[in-house]
Amino acid sequence: MTILNSLNQFSKGRLSWLLLLLFVVFFEACALYFQHVMMLAPCVMCIYERVAMMGVGVAAIVGLMAPNNPIFRWLGLIGWGLSSYKGLLLAQQHVDYQFNPSPFATCDLFVTFPSWRPLNQWAPWIFEAYGDCSKIVWQFLDLSMPQWLVVIFAGNLIALALIVI
């Protein structure tokens, strides 16, 4: 059995989806720690990236419900892929704001959610943005937070590709 077959079989069990969900919970907890304990103000792009990460979590829950059922498994895989791809695009745009600042290319001043789902009004402690997208407020191993998110979302897409192949 090849490693790709092993990964594919692993994705048909609950443990794989639980690990993905725990991965999301860990990174969301880190985001809230940075915001509420370290007092780092999240920007609009940070909030959108946070929502993309939550999309990965929702996909993990869908896959966790019935991993042997092809419909639930594929819905989970597709949701994981779409959320990771959108998160990667948002993180890359955020990196661009930080490393190529321009008065003509800036992020929005306020988060904009649909009127039927105003997350920033329902849970402002999680979804309200009041930081500057172009400001680098935290670094680890010489990478800013959006650069780490590029690594994380790209890693998700690579893991997904290895599982699906």
Curated annotation (Swiss-Prot):
InterPro entries reported in the protein's UniProt record: DiS_bond_form_DsbB/BdbC, Disulphide_bond_form_DsbB, DsbB, DsbB-like_sf
Single GO biological process annotation from the record: protein folding
Main localisation: membrane
Pfam families in alphabetical order: DsbB
Ranges per topology, Periplasmic: 34-51, 93-147
Membrane-spanning parts: 17-33, 52-67, 75-92, 148-165
GO cellular component, as recorded: plasma membrane
Keyword line: Cell inner membrane, Cell membrane, Chaperone, Disulfide bond, Electron transport, Membrane, Oxidoreductase, Redox-active center, Transmembrane, Transmembrane helix, Transport
Molecular-function annotations in GO: protein-disulfide reductase activity
Disulfide bond as UniProt keyword: yes
UniProt xrefs under SUPFAM superfamilies: DsbB-like
All ranges on the Cytoplasmic side of the membrane: 1-16, 68-74
Membrane topology: Multi-pass membrane protein
Keyword Iron assigned: no
Location in or out of the cell: Cell inner membrane
Disulfide bonds: 43-46, 107-133
Function: Required for disulfide bond formation in some periplasmic proteins. Acts by oxidizing the DsbA protein.
NCBIfam families: PRK01749.1 (NF002485)
HAMAP family membership: DsbB
Family in the record: Belongs to the DsbB family.
Name the record gives this protein: Disulfide bond formation protein B
Organism: Vibrio alginolyticus
